[in-house]
Each structure stands twice: as structure tokens, then as C-alpha cells.
Amino acid sequence: MDSADLFLDFKSPAFRNDPYPLYARLRARTALVPVRGSYLRGALFATRYQAVAELLKDPRFANDAHHAGASHAMGAWWMPRLFQTMGNNMLNSDEPRHKRLRNLVSRAFTPVRVREMRRAAEVIVERLLDDAARRGEVDLMSAFALPLPLAIISEMMGIPEADRARFHRGMTSLTNSFSGGIVGVLMQIPNGNRLLRLFEALIDKRRAEPRDDLISALVQAEEDGDRLSADDMVSMVFLLLLAGHETTVNLIGTGTLALLQHPEQLAALRARPEGIQCAIEELLRFTSPAIFTAPRYAREDLEFQGHKVTRGTPILGGVASANRDEKAFTDPERLDLAREPNKHLALGIGIHFCMGAPLARLEGSLAIPALIQRFPAMRLAVPAEQLQWRLPGNIRGLVALPLRPT
């Protein structure tokens, strides 16, 4: 690879189908590499663990593009209100706004609330596996990995039963649209507006008639007299749904594929199900559902990792590459469900660490053991080379995972 080849093409087949050899070659050459095929003009991609970890904590970089003299596509004046609301979320905020939003949301989205979902989540897992067991061949993505987190977050948010099928269809369609770039997203405006109206109506209803659910808790969250605005609540709901949903879907889907491709690790987990927490951390590292972080924008002309970076330049923290960095992990290309320590970056680091991490870990720790115990003889129904991958936004996941359960 000469200097002319030092770039990462988001639209290349290699990046979609198996990016890890490409990451390894880039890591060996440079900590920052230009990106092609992204809506972010002039974007760079951090390839190494140290570079990504420093990027996510360096105060010289902003999450809000406006603080670096740049702009964010989702917040453009011509964007529909839906996307402006979605883009103006906690993830794209800096201090003090980020701290204000996180403090308020953390009063509603608590570890206790997540733990209280365990029994309901177990029931949903068993119901979905019962349905899968009736089939001779099953697509794990559409039958289990996709509906599970949607069903759990629906229960957690208190979405009425009568609205759940419509909500599930709308969310699945919206998340799938990110694979089609900006055109795919814009085609989802009518669907997105329907979801927006559903959420706004639900927020209004919970404001008038609070219940024991996440929406009611967000409405009631207060700190020193401060409350979330209506737009803050809608953007937070979308953030929880989109970010949390895709992470869990692909932890389950790609994680199951990784186990099937490493039968000795699968057998070890079946023999020692109590090791599931450690296993989930390794599956997060090894599969890295999120390819990269939200962009960080240089607040000024600066030097980072030996590279000159001009003000306003967006840098993507390449967590999928960082999680396979030879300088951060021993034998990083090996799946080791007993790996400790395991300081992966799959859920971020620093003040923007994923708030939904406890829920993603709970869902994964219930779904994967139940799946492998229920179907001890499950196997791929097609050769692994025939599996197709999707790239909705910064996520890499399977289009389908055809399995023979027995």
C-alpha cells in the first residue's frame, strides 16, 4: 500500500464485506487516514486504539460542529424538522448542554429501571425462540435479533400495544434507510414524520397521565427546576431507539455468527454459561457493532497523532479498528470469550460513553445464552461467504442470518 492508497473508502466492497484486513494495513501505516464515500467532507478516520481513546477525551475537539466553525448536515436549515430534532441530541452536544441533558436523562434512564426490565425481557426472549423453534430454517435477524430490542424498548417506554406493530415497522424501515445514504434517509421523511407524531402524542399523554414507564420518567425528570423540552425528549427517544437498537441487533446477530465460526468458544460458553458477562464484552470487542463514533470536530488548527488538522475537520473514531489493535490487545484477531482485561471501545469512552450500555449488555446476556441452549445443534443454512452485510450509518451488520435451528 503506497501513500496514494492511504484512504478508507466507505463504499468499497472490502469495507462492507470484511474490513478487518484493511484496518490492519491502515493501522500499520498511520493513525489518521482520509475517508471517501462519506457525507462528511474532508473527514479523517482514526485507526489506532490510542488515537481513538485520545480523540474521545481531547477537549480540543467538539461534538457540536458549530463549536468548530463547521455545520452538521442533520441540522441544516433546509432539513425537515424531524431530522433537525434527531440531530440536535445529546450525542452531538458539548458542555454545558451535554451535561445538562445527560443529568436530566439519567434521572429517568436509571440502572434500576434497566434491571427491572429483566423479567419482561426474559419472557420476550422465550416467546421469540418458541416461534423460531417451529421453523425448519429461520433468519435470526428478522425472527430474533431485530424484534427483541424493539419489543424490550417498547415495553420500557410504555408504547401502547395497539401502536407497537406500527412502531416496529416504522423503526425498522427508518433504521434500514441509513444504508441508502442521504437519498435513502430523505425517502423516509413521511415515515419519520409519522413516528414523530406518535412520540409527540405519547409524550403529551404521559404529561397528562403519568405511568411507570420511561416516557413518563423523562417528562417528570427535573434538576434544580430544569426540565427537558419537548424537542429534547423527542431527540432523546430517537437516540435511545436508533443507537441502542442497532447496537443490540448486531451484537446478537454478528455475535452469533462469530460463535458459530468459533465452535470451541461456543462449546466453552455452553459449558460455562456463568461466563456470559465476560463473553458479551469480548463479542462487543470482536464484532464492534459500531464501526466508528460520532464525528469530533477540531476547534482550532492543531496537531493530533503527528498529523496537522485544520479547524472544522471532522474525525471519526474508528472503534472497530481500535478494538483489533495489536498494541492494545494480545492476539486481537482471536475470539477469546474469557479475555481479561478487555478495555474495548465498542461503547465509547469519556463523557459521551454510551448511556444505553447497561440495556445492551442485559439484552445480549439474556439473548445469546437462551439461543445457544435452546438450539445446541444450530448451524448456518448457507455458506458464510454468501452472507450479505449492511451499513446503516456507522453500524455494520448482517442483512440476514439464515440458520437451521436443529
Model-derived segments and their meaning:
Residues 1-406:
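Cytochrome P450
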